[in-house]
Amino acid sequence: TERSLVYETDPIRRTRAELAVIDCAYGADPRSAEVLRFDFLTRMAALLAAGKPVLLPVPKYGRGLEQLALLCRARPKAAVFGDAQFLYQLAWAQTDRFWLAPNARDSLTRVQVQPLTGIPDSGVCFLSDPQLKSPGTRKFADAFIAAGGSVVMTGTPERGSYSASLMQDGKMEYLRYPVHQNETEYRRLLRENHFSRPIPYHTPDFSAKREILF
């Protein structure tokens, strides 16, 4: 999405192309990025107010830093923990800031994230394995749940994944965090450019002819 809170983006405007493959992963979901972020913060506030820790399984790179920046801005006193990969990602962002949006550079430099070495009494915990594919992260998530903590999925669970099974069992909550476009944003991008043949990508809600002939 062009509306990242952390990453620098180059908006596509007045561009001509014969073929444009455009992200539309959220399809018919009408909620804007602003609404999704508000819903995310509202629910996270309620979970943290309960006095138990919250586990956020996130990709090795990407939305984790966005969620960190948003949560630290909204709840600056909340303790934050991250596994080794998350700390590596944060250290990279703090030193190589070329990819960061100007308003995120200072906030990510000042933020304090403690190593996630166990299950804390409270706070936000980032775990760099969204589908919980490794035995270690599965074991950690199970122990987290057994200790009374909340586990929140913010991306799309893969079919057959451990995260999907936790959601089916009611042990993992789902809060979509915006990193892709919906159909409204996809159509807006079309209006602001000149694409002869646009193809909406990554959505089951509607389709377009996908055969490409040269």
Predicted regions and their residues:
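Short gly/ser/thr-rich secondary-structure transition/capping motifs
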Residues: 1-6, 105-113, 134
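Accessory terminal helices/loops
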Residues: 70-129
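Short, charged, surface-exposed secondary-structure boundary motifs
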Residues: 5-8, 30-31, 88-94, 161-164, ...
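C-terminal regulatory/interaction regions
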Residues: 110-214
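His/Asp/Glu-rich metal-coordinating catalytic cores
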Residues: 1-64, 69-79
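Phosphate- and divalent-cation-binding pockets in alpha/beta enzyme and binding domains
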Residues: 65-70, 90, 136, 207-209
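Short, solvent-exposed amphipathic alpha-helical segments in soluble enzyme
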Residues: 11-15, 36-37, 70-75, 95-98, ...
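Short internal beta-strands
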Residues: 21, 77-88, 151-155, 199-202
